[in-house]
Amino acid sequence: MSLDVYLYERVTCPKCECRIDTNHRLYSANITHNLNRMAEAAGIYMHLWRPEEIGIDTAEQLIEPLAEGIRKLLANPKQMRTYNASNGWGMYEHFVPFVQEYLAACTEHPTARVEACR
């Protein structure tokens, strides 16, 4: 089982200036569910796995929480590694780059629509 995260392009209608969602995928990534406890410890479980449940629908809304989560991950590597999956599928060394890359994509595409599939 895994988590898939997506960013989709949103465009502005030139006539009425309303936002229109598109199916144009700007970013996607996948990570194992085995990292959910590490995400919780870093304070970003809901932001990654269930953004719609906390009112997040644009990438801009993820920038600060993900940045804070990365700070926590990097400040406490020893503690965070205690959440490594014993089977090797879900390690700190995989999770940190996943969150960093997702943050970079959110920063690059702040108006993008966020979607998470579990």
Annotate the PLM regions.
Residues 1-118:
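Acidic (Asp/Glu-rich) sequence patches and key acidic residues
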